[in-house]
């Protein structure tokens, strides 16, 4: 039963794919372990005309069916990012509930009754993908079947609701406003080139959004690019604050210990009644300087500790390579796959309704114990 539902949901998920590709994937899934492994290898090597999201989804389905298929780094990275905001306690609870669910119906009812968020559903998928041997075939198949059903229902809802594209446009508008604000910060902190680069990327995103308005094909790329720009805005804001702290500390500590006398102070800074300036006496000047030196020392110690932590993370824990990969895929989100998806979507649009439906609608062969037969 679960196998048949899985095939039906897979066909529904692939209904925008070329008929021959859809037939090949369904035949591989129903054709046993060797056929599925061959298809997974073709998907991994990008030999099938699938978009990046379709390819990772199909690889997840095939590995959950047959754990002998090796995991794909691209799919693992996608799952890791989708569950990065999930708390560890939530992950433990989800794993316990999964093992108690039993089968597809149990998994689906668990998702519905608990009203799982997207990241919680993706945690379930990540578990059966990363650790398939820890779960029974019923749990694995039930999880990916319920996940595909959720994706298909969302897809139908998005097709009839253009407000999703409106939300995307609003997000890009917010990013554009943020990039304009970064120009103001750049004037203080010397981040002018970064701000201009960010603004150019935001304009490109706006153009891409206008071209794909109302379409779901490019939505994952748009969302990923928007998150990348938002991340850069946040990072530049943090850099600006650090620069300002350092500049303030050094500018204060560079002042002489004795403050200017009262006559000089009034002459330079108190020319009108509208301006009031507090002029420090010598003792107050010493205290201010000591406080500034203390603040500067604390700031330098903080920066030194941060540098040591970053060095430990990079050389000892080896996190720099992962961070570089995250930056590459988040700030500049998969340009090659984006271009490939754009070209593939144009081919599908050109093909239109004239594409013959060559899907094999013959009954799917199952043995008595529910295993696929060739």
Curated annotation (Swiss-Prot):
Impact noted for substituting residue 279 to A: Complete loss of oligomerization
Transmembrane segments: 239-259, 289-309
One of the GO biological process terms: monoatomic ion transmembrane transport
Coiled-coil intervals, chain numbering: none
Reported modifications of this chain: Palmitoylated. N-glycosylated.
Extracellular-side segments: 260-288
The protein's role, per its UniProt record: Ion channel, which might have a role in genome packaging and uncoating processes.
Family: Belongs to the influenza C protein M1 family.
Stated name of the protein: Polyprotein p42
């Amino acid at each position: 039963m679960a196998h048949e539902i899985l095939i039906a949901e897979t066909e529904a998920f692939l209904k925008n794919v070329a008929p021959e590709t859809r037939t090949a994937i369904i035949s591989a899934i129903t054709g046993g372990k060797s056929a599925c492994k061959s298809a997974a290898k073709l998907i991994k090597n990008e030999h099938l005309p699938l978009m990046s999201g379709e390819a990772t989804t199909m690889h997840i389905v095939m590995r959950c069916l047959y754990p002998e298929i090796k995991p794909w780094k691209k799919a693992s990275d996608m799952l890791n990012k989708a569950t990065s905001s999930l708390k560890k306690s939530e992950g433990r609870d989800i794993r316990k509930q999964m093992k108690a669910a039993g089968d597809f119906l149990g998994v689906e009812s668990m998702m519905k009754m608990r009203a799982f968020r997207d990241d919680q559903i993706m945690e379930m998928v990540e578990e059966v993908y990363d650790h398939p041997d820890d779960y029974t075939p019923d749990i694995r198949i039930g999880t990916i079947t319920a996940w595909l059903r959720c994706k298909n229902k969302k897809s139908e809802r998005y097709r009839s609701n253009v407000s999703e594209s409106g939300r995307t446009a609003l997000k890009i508008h917010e990013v554009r406003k943020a990039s304009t604000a970064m120009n103001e910060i750049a004037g203080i902190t010397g981040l002018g080139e970064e701000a201009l680069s960010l603004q150019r990327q935001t304009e490109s995103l706006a153009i891409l959004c206008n071209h794909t308005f109302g379409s779901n094909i490019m939505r994952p790329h748009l969302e990923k690019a928007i998150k990348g720009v938002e991340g850069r805005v946040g990072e530049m804001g943090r850099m600006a604050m650090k620069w300002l702290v350092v500049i303030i500390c050094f500018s204060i500590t560079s002042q002489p210990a004795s403050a200017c006398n009262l006559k000089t102070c009034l002459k330079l800074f108190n020319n009108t009644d509208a301006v009031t300036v507090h002029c420090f006496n010598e003792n107050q000047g010493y205290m201010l300087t000591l406080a500034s030196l203390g603040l500067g020392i604390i700031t330098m110690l903080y920066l030194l500790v941060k540098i040591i932590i970053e060095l430990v993370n990079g050389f000892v824990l080896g996190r720099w390579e992962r961070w570089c990969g995250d930056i590459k895929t988040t700030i500049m989100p998969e340009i090659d796959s984006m271009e490939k998806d754009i070209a593939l979507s144009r081919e599908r649009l050109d093909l239109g309704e004239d594409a013959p439906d060559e899907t094999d609608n013959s009954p799917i062969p199952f043995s008595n114990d529910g295993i696929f037969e060739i």
